[in-house]
A protein has these predicted regions:
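Portal/gating segments that form or line small-molecule/metal binding sites
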Residues: 68
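Basic, Lys/Arg-enriched alpha-helical interface segments
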Residues: 1-65, 74-77, 85-102
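Short hydrophobic/aromatic beta-strand micro-patches
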Residues: 71
Length: 102
């Protein structure tokens, strides 16, 4: 049985995630739990614009669209770089830059 990885939230990512509506928080938590167990989230994609090894979890709820950027290619933990509510079709430049910096 694979080791259960820790989740490490960088910067304000935990605070940002906790500001999601309850259903979106639950969905994000479930997807992060899958990552901890070495499984693939249901709806994710690589974010090469942010950096090598960075992916995003995509969550769509009645209240809107939400994203969680993370890095899983480290053996010790899943690193959550940024969590945000999408307000436009494209990911905003400031969100990409913030995730890159972390």
């Amino acid at each position: 049985m694979p080791r259960h990885k820790d989740v490490v939230f960088l910067g304000s990512s935990l605070k940002d995630l906790n500001e999601f509506p309850l259903d979106a928080r639950r969905a994000a938590g479930f997807q992060l739990d899958l990552l901890q167990q070495g499984e693939q989230p249901f709806d994710c994609k690589p974010m090469k614009t942010i950096g090598r090894g960075v992916s995003e979890i995509r969550i769509t709820e009645e209240s809107g669209a939400f994203r969680v950027f993370y890095v899983i290619n480290r053996p010790e933990a899943v690193y959550v770089l940024h969590a945000l509510r999408k307000t436009t079709q494209k990911t905003e430049g400031r969100d990409i830059e913030l995730a890159r910096a972390r």
